[in-house]
Regions:
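The canonical Cys-X-X-Cys-His
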Residues: 37-52, 103, 107
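Extracytoplasmic beta-rich repeat domains
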Residues: 232-245, 273-294, 320-335, 375-404, ...
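Electrostatic cytochrome c docking/interface patches
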Residues: 21-40
């Protein structure tokens, strides 16, 4: 077996040893260095760590006691070396050493270290934060973990020329440029959202049931080899996992940086572009995954915790509602859904300790007015409020809603997955694995009219390894009976009765060693004992890793074959909990990780498998070295389309798994493929991008011979050759 390549980011810690016989001194820096570093930080770091350094998602706070404690008496050269190897995530090592030193100087200033006349350098004995109580300087001892043991210019063919005049719409936080009138767009009714026309893709997974299935059948198993490129559109650089929407041949696609574009689906011409403008000192940039539409509006949940309605024909802002305070870390990573005239959105960025926990909101689709708010953290004195140990409300972190939900129009229920409690590991959050922490790691069934939780199913109570169950809820009727299928990072496929949430079955899809007991009759799981008894600073080796199992790359359902097609990831990790301070504004993920190959897979990190919805049996599986980084798109032509880290897009026979066609893109295929039709001609659209979270990192960390070039985000559109 090849030796696993191990890389570390700001959140990663390894065991440490003491460097003795060396006089420690606080690193110095100049004011000029800090000023340059501030500008570099805003350009390269603020999208993840935020302008105020408080951090978001997996990016830690860089100006709190946890950061200072972590780097106390650790050498400046060690810190700069780590930055050079891992930052910025989309292009590690892209800055020169002096620029990394400038950023380090800015971080010192932000942590109340005063500037001096002496510039920051890599001199021996100079430590990032001097702490006389912490002992001698520490250096990292790299350990070999053992699984299972404790311890843009338009592309040719898109826009023909830059228009001389564009109509400009300016709002308080956005500017829209409209180049062409979108006259052929027809309003999208409630009835069409419930049952979309075959030619359109009006939900993030086409239908409100989140099946990712297109009923178009012009492209088949017999002719898919004749697919050719129709056009390409170059997208904004940055972390990108977009899910386009299509109506009447108009593509609406989210970009990094809170940019939304409308494209002509036949030619690739840009029709209008909405670009978010962020106030000074606030969040900038950020990932957008999904959009929603209703009537003549397109809805965007922005990374500064706003919900925005755009005019579908012009891109002009119709309304803009703040749903949370971005200064507290709140954000949106995925978009809302619309259910019968109500826009329903889940908030994320809830890792910090504040009383205002995560929630799901319902809004009037026409005005943006908030109709209801349902918290995903059970409050003291309410049902489930006693499942958080003795923690007061302000220290109940997590339960983010970071993926988009589903809607059953007949039952009039919406379904959302809720992520894990935070910090990731139970001992870090002052709890045990027996503290369920409702409603984290659950599927929620919600009445869209008032936000009432009709039922919930907590898949892994007391989840303690950042293996959340926050992903797609696929709604399937089997012989007239309504079911819900969902799968999380543990790789367990869950089957529920969607009327009640009652457990109906499960299937393990990848190797796992975190649960010592899985009750096949009830679905109850129990962690192995060393996980239940974890201690701060001790390492646990677990499978799968936080990449999954399964992650954001959504399942596709193929009704004719009754198969669920699931993108899976095969890797393991070693993980260690940190100690945190229980102070308002503290918190975060507070766990350290190293990734490694999964035993028995021959270092094939990507898996695509089909599961029969009746028996839950695996029908076929494909394993390869490159991780799969798109959702699965299934079609009535008997095909499943999917893309991977190694830049390939594949078309497989949905019933056998036989590969029938593939092509290669400029960078990793990443996001949510869609299919649509214009004048009876079927198209397949595949996004490319980088920085898909843990699933993308598996390729960059463990398969270094596979390359994912930077700055090639795009939308590739294919059709049959004439």
């Amino acid at each position: 077996m090849k030796t696993a390549l191990k890389l570390w980011s700001l959140t990663f810690l390894l065991s440490s040893t003491v460097l003795s016989g060396q006089e420690l001194k606080q690193a110095s820096f100049s004011a000029d260095q800090a000023a340059r570093g501030s500008e570099l930080y805003q350009q390269n770091c603020a999208a993840c760590h935020l302008a105020n350094l408080t951090g978001s998602f997996e990016a830690p706070n860089l100006a709190d006691t946890g950061f200072r404690s972590n780097w106390a008496n650790r050498r400046v050269d060690e810190f700069v070396d780590m930055l050079q190897r891992t930052m910025p995530p989309q292009a590690p090592g892209s800055l020169d050493q002096s620029q990394y030193l400038d950023i380090s100087a800015f971080l010192l200033e932000a942590n109340n270290i005063s500037a001096s006349a002496t510039a920051l350098s890599l001199s021996a004995g100079s430590v990032l934060f001097l702490d006389n109580k912490a002992g001698a300087a520490r250096v990292l001892e790299r350990r070999t973990p053992v699984p299972g043991l404790a311890g843009t210019v338009p592309s040719p063919g898109t826009r023909n020329s830059v228009p001389e005049i564009a109509t400009i719409y300016q709002s308080e936080r956005a500017r829209t440029r409209s180049f062409e009138s979108v006259n052929k767009f027809r309003n999208v009714s409630n009835e069409e959202l419930a049952n979309p026309p075959a030619a359109d893709w009006t939900y993030w997974r086409r239908s409100p049931q989140s099946q990712g299935y297109s009923p178009l059948d012009q492209i088949t198993t017999d002719n898919v080899g004749q697919l050719s490129l129709a056009w390409v559109w170059g997208m904004e650089p940055g972390r990108s996992q977009p899910a386009p929407l299509v109506r009447d041949g108009i593509i609406f696609i989210p970009n990094f940086g809170n940019v939304v574009q409308a494209l002509d689906g036949r030619s690739g011409n840009l029709l209008w572009e909405y670009r978010r403008q962020f106030p000074e000192g606030g969040r900038s940039g950020g990932l957008l995954r999904t959009l929603a539409m209703w009537e003549d509006l397109v809805y965007v949940a922005t990374t500064d915790a706003h919900l925005v309605a755009l005019d579908a024909r012009s891109g002009a802002v119709r309304w803009d509602s703040e749903i949370a305070d971005e200064a507290l870390g709140y954000s949106n990573t995925s978009g809302p859904i619309v259910a019968d005239g109500i826009v329903i959105n889940g908030i994320s960025g809830c890792g910090r300790f504040f009383e205002q926990s995560c929630f799901i909101t319902g809004h009037d689709a026409a005005t943006g007015a908030e109709l209801w708010r349902t918290y995903t953290v059970a409050r003291p004195g309410e049902p489930g409020g006693d499942t958080w140990g003795d923690l007061p409300l302000e220290f109940r972190g997590g339960a983010d809603v970071w993926m988009t939900g589903s809607w059953d129009p007949e039952m009039d229920l919406v379904f959302f997955g809720v992520a894990q409690a935070k910090p990731w590991m139970s001992v870090s959050r002052g709890m045990s694995a027996d503290d369920a922490a409702l409603y984290s790691n659950s599927t929620l069934a919600i009445d869209p009219s008032d936000g009432r939780i009709v039922w919930y199913r907590q898949h892994v109570p007391g989840e303690s390894l950042d293996m959340d169950e926050a992903f797609e809820q696929v709604l399937v009727d089997i012989v007239g009976e309504p079911y819900l299928f969902t799968i999380g990072k543990s790789g367990i496929l869950w089957k529920l009765d969607r009327r009640s949430g009652e457990f109906q079955g499960l299937r393990e899809t990848t190797y796992q060693n975190v649960f010592s007991d899985i009750n096949l009759e009830t679905g109850e799981v129990r962690y192995r004992e060393d996980i239940r008894n974890m201690q701060v600073g001790e390492w646990l080796s677990v499978c799968p890793s936080t990449a999954g199992g399964h992650n954001w790359q959504s399942t596709g359902y193929h009704p004719p074959s009754r198969n669920l097609i699931i993108p899976l990831s095969q890797s393991c990790m070693e993980m260690s909990p940190r100690e945190i301070e229980f102070e308002v504004g503290s918190g975060g993920n507070q766990g350290d990780r190293q990734w490694m190959p999964m035993p028995g897979t021959e270092e094939r990190f990507g898996k695509l498998a089909a599961y029969d919805v009746d028996s839950m049996e695996e029908e076929w599986a494909i394993q390869q070295r490159a991780p799969f980084l798109t959702a699965a798109l299934t079609t009535a032509g008997g095909l499943v389309f999917i893309g991977d880290y190694d830049r390939y897009v594949h078309a497989y026979d949905v019933e056998t798994g036989q590969e029938l066609w593939r092509t290669r893109l400029a960078t990793s295929a990443q996001g949510f493929p869609v299919s649509f039709a214009i004048d009876g001609e079927q198209y397949i659209a595949i996004p490319s991008g980088r920085e898909g979270g843990s699933p993308w990192r598996i390729g960059s960390f463990l398969a270094p011979e596979l390359q994912s070039p930077n700055n090639h985000n795009a939308l590739y559109v294919f059709k049959l050759s004439p």
